[in-house]
Amino acid sequence: MEEERKTAELQKNRIQDSVVFEDVAVDFTQEEWALLDLAQRNLYRDVMLENFQNLASLGYPLHTPHLISQWEQEEDLQTVKRELIQGIFMGEHREGFETQLKTNESVASQDICGEKISNEQKIVRFKRNDSWFSSLHENQESCGIDYQNKSHERHLRNHMVENIYECYEENQDGQTFSQVPNLDSLKRNTEVKSCECHECGKAFVDHSSLKSHIRSHTGSKPYQCKECGKAFHFLACFKKHMKTPTEEKPYECKECTKAFSCSSFFRAHMKIHIGKTNYECKECGKGFSCSSSLTEHKRIHSGDKPYECKECGKAFSCSSSLSKHKRIHSGDKPYECKECGKAFSSSSHLIIHIRIHTGEKPYECKECGKAFSESSKLTVHGRTHTGEKPYKCKECGKAYNCPSSLSIHMRKHTGEKPYECLECGKAFYLPTSLNTHVKNQSREKPYECKECGKAFSCPSSFRAHVRDHTGKIQYECKECGKTFSRSSSLTEHLRTHSGEKPYECKECGKAFISSSHLTVHIRTHTGEKPYECKKCGKAFIYPSALRIHMRTHTGEKPYECKECGKAFRHSSYLTVHARMHTGEKPFECLECGKAFSCPSSFRRHVRSHTGEKPYECKECGKAFVCPAYFRRHVKTHTRENI
């Protein structure tokens, strides 16, 4: 009687506190199931079989679960359902399962919580830790990711040290576990994310995940598609690529027509248009649609660049940038345009290039309606409306709205001219200037000035030149009233008032008000004279000197004095001559007060005070104040040699 009473009480407790199959089942929707690869589906099937069999082995009278009954009505899961049901009811464990249904006798005991109990009692002795679930739901905002039903519960286990199930026997050992089948894990070490990356410090739950992550540092992509040659870091990505029919991208964005082969990429892209930003940077407040973008962005603030190129040592903040960079060394250009055959090292460059053929300009300015083929060009254009110029020159303080303009400007300080003409050796700051120069050499110059005969291949250069003759003034100096036909000329002139000389020679430290003056000066150090007279072979440092020299051969004197009719080859000669009529002497010596009409005469006079004699004869060492005296002296040595 006593034994029957205990058995009845045990059965009653079992009904009240038992763990049913649905408590340990993992449920998937049709959409979620479609995203699983073969390995994941097999794992799912094995886990579900093990869960059901373990519950059955505890002696609990189970019928076909409601979950499995549902599966039988869903056609996409037919194969797995059939295998699962057959594995439970008709497979190798059927005999043991039926035996457990027929008997309530105690079977082999098992060590749980340091105490030996029977399988008959297991179902009673362990229950759901309801206090864990209550605290779990109170803190469901822990990471901002939304889940539904049991998916949320499973996800929240990652945030908790505790697991779902605890020992019901007064919780003597305080030990917990997450699933009924894993009873052996009670004594297992529960330390999480024990595998850490030595490169960036990121931690992972298992060694295989760490191994996959390390490939992002090394750039290793062991899984390559034989059809298109595309390689992948991860086997799952490779499998997904292989399943996707060639060139098929069924997920198309209606906003910008960009297409995707994967629904998850499409959803992440859509967040860009709708402005949905789940992840926000605490440093600057910038929002991102996915966590990986935020992680990469944070490295801008920290300066962290964990991905380093082994070829040149250059480091990058994200693995994709390193992968693109490596193609510079390898010369690999896997993305080819089907229209013109041009190849690119990155898919984004190909997408932008294709828009040249299609004429597509998806990025439109909301201010003026102007459209662009690249988002970066729209960003730069937007600054013309806001006036923002974030890229500032450290040498002279001039600011620009895009980095390329700053890079070009910096060449004026350094004197760098990377674009050189193969015909004459002349170098330029800009590729466009070189292109114009090359065209000028190979084509006619139809735009000829009627005043001085100078010809131009470009109409804009011709119009600017004509203003010099016509006196058509557009830009006036507010300091002295002097006027100019070009804004750049006014800018340079203003520096004569401010004393600013932003362009400094690195050889001797001498500074200049314009970059062109610095360029000419640098040639005095290098000895370069790129402009040569075809008549006599004499070479000059700058083109204007060659043009003036050519007039000695042609006899041309385009600059005529209106007072006396005397003509000159150079405009500066006419300016000095005109002062003879006006009596103007603007160059005054601070030492003695003597004034001069010509700057060269003034400089010669100043040397009489300082004793400077810059023109020295290499034959005898004698020095002179002015170049005319020096040239006269050199001729005396040539006569002696004759």
Curated annotation (Swiss-Prot):
Residues 19-90 form the KRAB domain. SMART domains: KRAB, ZnF_C2H2. InterPro entries: KRAB, KRAB_dom_sf, Znf_C2H2_sf, Znf_C2H2_type. It is found in: Nucleus. PROSITE patterns: KRAB, ZINC_FINGER_C2H2_1, ZINC_FINGER_C2H2_2. A zinc finger (C2H2-type) spans 195-217, 223-245, 251-273, 279-301, 307-329, 335-357, 363-385, 391-413, 419-441, 447-469, 475-497, 503-525, 531-553, 559-581, 587-609, 615-637. Gene3D superfamilies: 6.10.140.140, Classic Zinc Finger. GO terms for biological process: regulation of transcription by RNA polymerase II. One of its GO terms (molecular function) is zinc ion binding. Its main location: nucleus. Pfam families: KRAB, zf-C2H2, zf-C2H2_4. Keywords: Deafness, DNA-binding, Intellectual disability, Metal-binding, Nucleus, Repeat, Transcription, Transcription regulation, Zinc, Zinc-finger. The keyword DNA-binding applies. One of its GO terms (cellular component) is nucleus. May be involved in transcriptional regulation. It is linked to DEGCAGS syndrome: An autosomal recessive neurodevelopmental disorder characterized by global developmental delay, coarse facial features, and abnormalities of the cardiovascular, gastrointestinal, genitourinary and skeletal system. Other common features included anemia or pancytopenia, immunodeficiency and recurrent infections, and sensorineural hearing impairment. Death in childhood may occur. Belongs to the krueppel C2H2-type zinc-finger protein family. PANTHER family: ZINC FINGER PROTEIN, ZINC FINGER PROTEIN 850. This is Zinc finger protein 699. It comes from Homo sapiens. The lineage of its organism: Eukaryota, Metazoa, Chordata, Craniata, Vertebrata.
